[in-house]
Amino acid sequence: MNKQKLTYLTIGVIVFYICLLVAWHLYDPTAHFTELQPGADHRPAGHVRKADDVLIGEFFMQDSSHPSTLNSKPSALKGEWPCFRNIHRDNQTTLTPAMKWVEGDMKEMWSVETGEGHAAPVISEGRVYVLDYDEQLNSDALRCFDLQTGKQLWRRWYRVPMKRNHGFSRTIPAVSQGLVVTIGPEGHVMCCDKTTGEMRWSIDMKKRFGTEIPFWYTGQCPLIQGDELVLAPAGKDTLMVGIDLQTGSTLWGTPNTVGFKMSHSSVMPMILGGVQTYVYIGVGGVCGVSAEGGNRGQLLWNANAWQPSVVAPSPLQISSNQIFLVAGYGAGGALLQVDRQGATWTASIRDSYKASEGMSSEQQTPINYQGSLITILPKDGGGMRERLAMYRPDDLHHPVWTSAADERFGLGPYLVIDDRLFAFKEDGELYVYQLHPSSMILLHKQRVMEEGVDAWGPMAYADGMLLLRDSKTIKCLKIATNN
């Protein structure tokens, strides 16, 4: 009898759970849901974008402590260092007659923290511009500061997620005709009003030209010549391009018939064979493009006998028809000669050598100072590695002067002001030398960064103030005062 009851009970439990399972499958939990139509949540309209879209210049912020920034009067400071290597692309400038050197230690005027990188500042009419990378926002950020105080006036930024690769930021802005132009690490070109930060136009070089961004990101700095911006996207079809500075429209383009790819180098203007020329070292070789009149954008010549896989320094003209080429990672240096006979151009490598065999550089572009060539030798430069060195254009294998054995600068930058050379060790120590035709004399050295790391970004000078940076900090030193 108990066994029979247990059987009935078991059957009943099984039937119950079968019914429960069937009901669970038949029940529709969304039967009473109401579909929410677009706009029903009353949220403001957003941007519709694809996963890889970058809305260049999307965000803007003005410093609330500077409410008059957008309508400010011209600054009393008129000094300019408006682009990579200054306006003449020679990395040199002069003191105004009204100024004199600060003797001894130079005073720090201000200091600003940045995202990790090597993007360097420019100066125009009392303002400082730098294309930083905000690691918290994953964004390129054009920041504008007051030169005298270091206070941020405004910034414009856009999201572009990246992975750290020796930091993030790389390039130097260009300022001209009231505008500031930047190129981000991933090839995003942005043009803004230099006073207000108002967005003017933008170009994504990867999307428009099919540019392949170098492994260590874009190092190319924008070149402004008159009313046009010159870029070397080195994309699938376009080697070089001229952009209307005011509108962002394309003025001319050079077909990439040579098949070059983008390097870390920048376009340099030169006069060769009596012709204004844009010279560029790409991955694959070096080329010259006409910058004149109706021939603008015409490929005049190219050479591929010297083609390092990684190029950071830019080409340096050392005579009316000779260009010094240099790169790191074992590439060494080379001498390129460009000749013209009527409409016929020839470009040939006249000399090339390893870094330990002559004048070379890994990152910084050398300086041509009154016929003497100044460089910091690379890590593979033999016994003189990382030292300052001076060469003659007619002998690139034997220096006429080098810095002392304990004066080694790594990948640090250097510039010339009047007859003084300022060289910045990559660990944050500044050296000042008196320049002579065949030598330099050390005048002063000063620790600027207490624990400087990777101080590779180029320096800038204007109105008595020198801007320097390491991987995470920009500092301003007062190096000259009014008489």
Model-derived regions, located:
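Aromatic (tryptophan-biased) beta-strands that constitute blades/sheets of beta-rich domains
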Residues: 4-10, 22-114, 140-162, 198-211, ...
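Short loop/turn segments immediately following the C-termini of beta-strands
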Residues: 86-89, 133-135, 185, 234-235, ...
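Extracytoplasmic beta-rich repeat domains
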Residues: 109-122, 137-138, 155-174, 202-224, ...
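Short coil/turn segments that connect the beta-strands within blades of beta-propeller domains
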Residues: 125-126, 177-178, 226-227, 274-276, ...
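Residue position within the beta-strands of beta-propeller blades
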Residues: 128-130, 182, 231, 280, ...
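Structural motif
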Residues: 137-141, 237-241, 285-290, 330-337, ...
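Loop/turn-rich, solvent-exposed surfaces of beta-rich toroidal or solenoidal domains
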Residues: 331, 357-437
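Blade-level signature of beta-propeller repeat domains, shared across WD40, Kelch, NHL, RCC1
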Residues: 428-429, 452-483
